[in-house]
Amino acid sequence: MAEILIATERNEKGKTARKKGFIPGIIYGKDREGQSINFERGKLIAFLKEKGEKSKMNFQLNGENKQGIIKEVGRDAVTSSIIHIDIQEVSALEKVRWTIPIFFEGREQLKKKELYIQVYLTEVEVEGKASDIPNNITLNVGNLELGEEVKVKDLNIGSNIRIFNELENTIAIISSSQNTNKNIEEEDPSEVE
């Protein structure tokens, strides 16, 4: 069963909540007004480290189990510590538009072949039922060869999920890790007047 985080109603300012060890936030949805909430700092940070900052989450508010998607994680400009979170409450069957991250695995295999991955796109915008949308897309690039590329159209996330990015957009290209500037001609200083 997925971890359920406890949210509590917040009546104080965000700064006060942070001093008490909470991360303040707001929850909103199709049939609800925005509501100020708090999450216990340590538990929310552990959840975000494990699931990511653009994931679905199960939480409890006033004894009621709810599901939401993380829309934004606010960070302090100097320390980059988390200072706020915005959550859109959704039902499993509700259609939502959401940005999900792309993760790459298999970089070690590429390195053994003296190849590396040039990443051009790290997330895609999708729409579908909340229950059908994955928290992320993981691409295994370990078996790809020099010059091969992955495009948005190559993603396999289900026919019931609409992707808003251009299908021909390049996600990543496999390149050589060797120096590609072999034939750089140096200017002869004696030719300069």
Curated annotation (Swiss-Prot):
GO molecular-function terms, A-Z: 5S rRNA binding; structural constituent of ribosome
Keywords attached to this entry: Ribonucleoprotein, Ribosomal protein, RNA-binding, rRNA-binding
Query: Where are its TM segments located?
Result: none
Entry-linked Pfam families: Ribosomal_L25p, Ribosomal_TL5_C
The protein's job, in short, is: This is one of the proteins that binds to the 5S RNA in the ribosome where it forms part of the central protuberance.
Give the family, as the similarity comment puts it.
Belongs to the bacterial ribosomal protein bL25 family. CTC subfamily.
The molecule here is called Large ribosomal subunit protein bL25
